[in-house]
């Protein structure tokens, strides 16, 4: 199940980030702490009462010189588009302002649950002064103090009551779920539109069960069925926040959550940026199958070595994605786009691959015969046996006499031998070393 999304919106200086940080940092256990995105706290995975969810601090979307109203609109549009539950924050110290009314009116157009949190209610006496906020027309309100952590438990209890039922989630029914991610302007939308063009049969647009995203199902001439996740979001135009880097990262994280295979799009003209590596790292850490797509290849002056040189650059910059195949395409001319569905299917097959224990142990023992296990202070690592315990990604447990004797380099050696013996192109594999009891 994809984690529900909670967005925090409100006019400036009402304490949105304080509430966000308090909820994410103290009152809620952070499930995973990723560098970069959680550093600026735009998007934080979190948990409350055994519900896992993701929080968006829309205040992280900054539009620079854009007028105030446009910045507020960007926040609210982001919340309405992406969230399952919206928390509007106002300030109990200042009372209802015209800007609060602007935000509330924008939220009227959504049928998603909106919860009003009146912040800066730092003592019980202040509760008597907050009833004017009912005039915003958002129903029940929750007095809280972000700076003191007061009232957040009640607020979160109300939030999780609105989360969708796991039972309502769509079944994948054998279709391969994949997403196309990348920085703004690398050509994601062009690739999406080309792949959903006349040579594809659109079976249906599936309404997302936990948000308004549209997942597009299509079949190839070979009869393979795919679900391209959140194509509605990729194809939107004219949103004021569409080209902000933080929004791009946030959308990529959501796509990773909802997909089995990730197509990471790079721009051949612009080259590789830090954000490319940042987002790719999230997909790798999540254990998703990966394909690297280099778009705008038609715009590059080439000789007989250009493609190989660019591939070497990718391998150098994305050392952790050495398993990901690279495809050079042009959404403008259609070059090689017809090959993408088959490659997605191949890496998805590898992502789901199971290896019998007997075959796996033959490979492990052959590897040890070629390169004996390491020793430390006269003690030699002994590998007893290995077995596969999971797929998506393929995960193997290796039982040894002492975990401390398994050096990283030898673990990497065994992983490489497993990859040589079995085709795991496109998928990370996990090795877990355990001491045999």
Swiss-Prot record:
It comes from the Bacteria. InterPro entries: G_ENGA, GTP-bd, GTPase_Der, KH_dom-like, KH_dom-like_a/b, P-loop_NTPase, Small_GTP-bd. Transmembrane segments: none annotated. Keywords: GTP-binding, Nucleotide-binding, Repeat, Ribosome biogenesis. The keyword Hydrolase does not apply. GTP 2 binds at residues 182-189, 230-234, 295-298. GO terms for biological process: ribosome biogenesis. Residues 4-167, 176-352 form the EngA-type G domain. Residues 353-437 form the KH-like domain. GTP 1 binds at residues 10-17, 57-61, 119-122. CDD domains: EngA1, EngA2. Pfam families: KH_dom-like (PF14714), MMR_HSR1 (PF01926). GO terms for molecular function: GTP binding; ribosome binding. PANTHER family: GTPASE DER. Associates with the 50S ribosomal subunit. GTPase that plays an essential role in the late steps of ribosome biogenesis. Belongs to the TRAFAC class TrmE-Era-EngA-EngB-Septin-like GTPase superfamily. EngA (Der) GTPase family. This is GTPase Der. It comes from Leuconostoc citreum (strain KM20). The lineage of its organism: Bacteria, Bacillati, Bacillota, Bacilli, Lactobacillales.
């Amino acid at each position: 199940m994809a984690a529900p999304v909670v967005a925090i919106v409100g006019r400036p200086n009402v304490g949105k980030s304080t509430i966000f940080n308090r909820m994410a940092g103290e009152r809620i256990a952070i499930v995973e702490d990723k560098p970069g995105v959680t550093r600026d706290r735009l998007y934080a995975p979190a948990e409350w009462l055994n519900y896992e969810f993701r929080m968006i601090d829309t205040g992280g979307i900054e539009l620079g010189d854009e007028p105030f109203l446009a910045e507020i609109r960007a926040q609210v549009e982001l919340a309405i588009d992406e969230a399952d539950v919206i928390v509007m924050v106002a300030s109990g110290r200042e009372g209802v302002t015209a800007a609060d009314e602007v935000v509330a009116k924008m939220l009227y157009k959504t049928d998603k649950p909106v919860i009003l949190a009146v912040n800066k209610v730092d003592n019980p006496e202040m509760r008597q002064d907050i009833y004017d906020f009912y005039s915003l027309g958002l129903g029940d309100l929750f007095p809280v103090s972000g700076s003191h952590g007061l009232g957040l438990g009640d607020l979160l209890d109300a939030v999780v009551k609105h989360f969708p039922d796991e039972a309502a989630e769509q079944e994948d029914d054998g279709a391969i779920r994949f997403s196309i991610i990348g920085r703004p302007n690398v050509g994601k939308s062009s690739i999406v539109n080309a792949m959903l063009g006349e040579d594809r049969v659109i079976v249906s647009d599936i309404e997302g069960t936990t948000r308004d995203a549209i997942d597009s199902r299509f079949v190839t001439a070979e009869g393979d069925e795919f679900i391209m996740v959140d194509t509605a979001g990729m194809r939107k135009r004219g949103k004021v926040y569409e080209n902000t880097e933080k929004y791009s990262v946030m959308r990529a994280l959501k796509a990773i959550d909802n997909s089995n295979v990730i197509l990471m799009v790079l721009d051949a003209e612009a080259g590789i940026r830090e954000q490319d590596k940042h987002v790719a790292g999230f997909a790798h850490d999540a254990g998703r199958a990966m394909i690297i797509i280099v778009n705008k290849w038609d715009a590059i002056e080439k000789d007989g070595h250009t493609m190989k040189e660019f591939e070497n650059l990718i391998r150098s910059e994305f050392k952790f994605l050495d398993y990901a195949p690279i495809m050079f395409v042009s959404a403008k001319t259609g070059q090689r786009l017809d090959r993408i569905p088959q490659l997605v299917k191949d890496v998805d097959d590898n992502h789901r691959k199971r290896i019998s224990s007997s075959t796996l142990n033959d490979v492990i023992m052959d590897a040890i015969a070629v390169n004996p296990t390491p020793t430390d202070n006269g003690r030699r690592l002994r590998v007893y046996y290995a077995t596969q315990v999971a797929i998506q990604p393929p995960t193997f447990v290796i039982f040894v006499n002492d975990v401390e004797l398994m050096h990283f380099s030898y673990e990497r050696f065994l992983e490489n031998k497993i990859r040589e013996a079995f085709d795991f192109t496109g998928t990370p594999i996990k090795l877990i070393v355990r001491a045999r009891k």
